[in-house]
C-alpha cells in the first residue's frame, strides 16, 4: 500500500513539474538533499541543498524555455524511512533553431519520510550536449559571432 501511495504522489508531482511548476520538486526535497545531473555538459552538476536544486531548475528553464518533462514509468521500493524511486522520463522542447528536441532520462531518488534526500538523473548526454550547443549559439548576437 505504501509503495502505491508513493508512486501516485510521484506521478502527481511529475504532472505538475511537467507543467513548469519546478518549485514543487524543491518543496519535496530535504534541506540537505544531494542532486546530481550526470555529465560533462552545461546542466551537469552535483550539488547539495534546496537552493542549489532551485538554481539548477532556473538554469534548465533559461536554457530550454518551455521544456516539457513527462514521467513514463515509476518503480518504488522500501519503507517510509528508506524509500527508493526509479523513474523513466521523456523530455521534449523546441530549440532556438525551431527544431524539436527529444530525449529520455532515468531518475534514481532516495527518500526519507516523503522527502527527497538524494536525486540522481542521467540523460543521453550526446543529444543533450548538441541541444545545449544550439541553444547557446542562438544566444550569441551576430556582432559577437563575427567579432
Regions found by a protein language model. Name each.
Residues 23, 30-78:
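A solvent-exposed, acidic/Ser-Thr-rich amphipathic alpha-helical stretch
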Residues 1-31, 136-147:
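Short, low-complexity N-terminal intrinsically disordered segments enriched in polar/charged residues
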Residues 118-147:
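Low-complexity, intrinsically disordered terminal/linker segments enriched in charged
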Residues 63-66, 92-102:
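Short, cysteine-centered beta-strand-loop-beta hairpins and adjacent loop/turn segments enriched
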Residues 35-37, 87, 118-119:
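Short hydrophobic/aromatic-rich beta-strand segments that constitute the beta-sheet cores
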